[in-house]
From Swiss-Prot:
One of its GO terms (biological process) is response to stress. Pfam families: Staph_reg_Sar_Rot. The keyword Transcription applies. It is found in: Cytoplasm. Belongs to the SarA family. GO terms for molecular function: DNA binding; DNA-binding transcription factor activity. Transmembrane segments: none annotated. This is HTH-type transcriptional regulator SarU. Gene3D superfamilies: Winged helix-like DNA-binding domain superfamily/Winged helix DNA-binding domain (1.10.10.10). The gene is sarU. One of its GO terms (cellular component) is cytoplasm.
Length: 247
């Protein structure tokens, strides 16, 4: 497999893991979800007094029901205001007051400090792709969301599926077991088992019981499966270039 293609997929996996672990850190610091923080960052960096709900949904990579739900939650928490257009009540606008803007700025400034501390503590500062502050973090996050959607709609694969295929193809001359996968990727054991079963049913890997010990599940791929994985990685690597969003 082409080295650059393999490295791009590896970076994709590393960046997703970074976002996952940083999100766990943020959950301990805030009573806000990552989606709520994204909307606050949206208003902070757009720096506009009032924005239509339609525009927000168009800019943020979440389905309409998710955006509406999180805007409603942020409104209850006093970060933003939601109102209907007087001329056309079907049009909903979201606005922030000067006081709310200061409140949002405090959250974003604190987030910048957390990201800086997290990078230093986990030694992420050595990676060129690691975000230095919240704006870079959310750009990275939205690129990951875009790439996950690509996997889902183009190949009917989850990110976990891709991670497993990466580990197996990187050690294609070995016969692995579930423990090898568990030690190589961030997901929990039951999630890995379900994904392996799904990939086995789709014919993308071979799962079999060890003859020496039937409790051990062995996983391998043949040449045809390797070529299929190679094709998926090649197509995926082409869409992993950074994209510009609303920032």
């Amino acid at each position: 497999m082409d080295y650059q293609t393999f490295e791009k997929v590896n970076k994709f996996i590393n960046v997703e893991a970074y976002i996952f672990f940083l999100t766990q850190e943020l959950k301990q610091q805030y009573k806000l979800s990552l989606k709520e923080l994204l909307i606050l960052a949206y208003f902070y960096y757009k720096n506009e007094h009032s924005i239509s709900l339609k525009e927000i949904i168009g800019d943020i990579l979440y389905k309409q029901s998710d955006v509406v739900k999180n805007i409603k939650s942020l409104s209850k928490k006093g970060f933003i205001n939601k109102s209907r257009n007087e001329a056309d009540e079907r049009r909903i606008f979201v606005s922030v007051t000067p006081i709310q803007r200061k409140k949002i700025a405090c959250v974003i400034n604190e987030l910048d400090k957390i990201i800086k501390g997290f990078n230093k503590e986990r030694d992420y500062i050595k990676y060129q792709w690691a975000p230095k502050y919240s704006k870079e973090f959310f750009i990275l996050f939205m690129n990951i969301m875009y790439s996950k959607d690509f996997l889902k709609y183009r190949f009917n694969l989850t990110f976990l599926d891709l991670s497993i295929l990466y580990v197996i193809s990187s050690r294609k001359n070995e016969i692995l077991n579930l423990k090898d996968l568990f030690e190589s990727i961030r997901f929990m054991y039951p999630q890995i088992v379900r994904s392996v079963n799904r990939l086995n049913n789709k014919g993308m890997l071979i799962k079999e019981r060890s003859l020496a010990d039937e409790r051990i599940v062995l996983i391998k791929i043949n040449k045809i499966q390797y070529n299929t994985i190679k094709s998926i990685f090649t197509d995926t690597s082409k869409i992993l270039k950074p994209r510009k969003f609303f920032f």
